[in-house]
Curated annotation (Swiss-Prot):
Reaction(s) catalysed (UniProt annotation): 2-C-methyl-D-erythritol 4-phosphate + CTP + H(+) = 4-CDP-2-C-methyl-D-erythritol + diphosphate
Protein's recorded name: 2-C-methyl-D-erythritol 4-phosphate cytidylyltransferase
InterPro entries: IspD, IspD/TarI, IspD/TarI_cytidylyltransf_bact, ISPD_synthase_CS, Nucleotide-diphossugar_trans
UniProt keywords, alphabetically: Isoprene biosynthesis, Nucleotidyltransferase, Transferase
Pathway where it operates: Isoprenoid biosynthesis; isopentenyl diphosphate biosynthesis via DXP pathway; isopentenyl diphosphate from 1-deoxy-D-xylulose 5-phosphate: step 2/6
Site feature location: Transition state stabilizer: 17, 25
Role of this protein: Catalyzes the formation of 4-diphosphocytidyl-2-C-methyl-D-erythritol from CTP and 2-C-methyl-D-erythritol 4-phosphate (MEP).
Species in which this protein is naturally found: Bordetella petrii (strain ATCC BAA-461 / DSM 12804 / CCUG 43448)
Amino acid sequence: MTDSLIAIVPAAGVGQRAGRPDLPKQYRLLAGQPMLRWAVAALLADARIGQVRVAVSPGDERAGAALAGLPRTVCRPCGGPTRAATVAAALADSNAADSDWILVHDAARPGLPPDALARLIDACLADAVGGLLALPVADTVKAGGPRVRATLDRDGLWLAQTPQMFRAGVLRAALAAAQAGGGTVTDEASAIEAAGHAPLLVPGAMRNFKVTWPDDFELMEKWL
């Protein structure tokens, strides 16, 4: 029997940098649809993903309307105070077997193209650890603020994207260990790394950027 592929979209945040404190950014409209709907639909484009589980904050009254009519989609009020807590809760809520594959995708990455998603799944299914979409750093990188302290060597540096795809058992254990240790987990791959694994880097796509700042909304609309 083929192991299941389950996607998790943590959508319990508010997006404080996006310029609309009255509306969480995942519900802001892009080309006429909530950003969250675009992100979930991008995952549903690959038939190998059996289910997309969206984790929202308890009491969230917007998610139902934003996701109405989408197939293979489950919305659960299991969002936590941090991304790691939300993903861990969604993973527990899914009852996924340890051998199932979990793809975690940002609600703020609505521009995920089908070919990048397929590339990630193909690569990870053939890998012992799993991996993530990422892009090699192209710009010169400076450290400092407000003045330059140093120019960093960009050779070998990658910008992490999502989805990030790992076996449920491995991810569950890595997140639990990271939370118990009190460290900051900014993405699933960092928890996997802390557990001693080396995730695979799979080339992503420029249009799969994370909508973060007010100007990003206009830019993303050009892609959708």
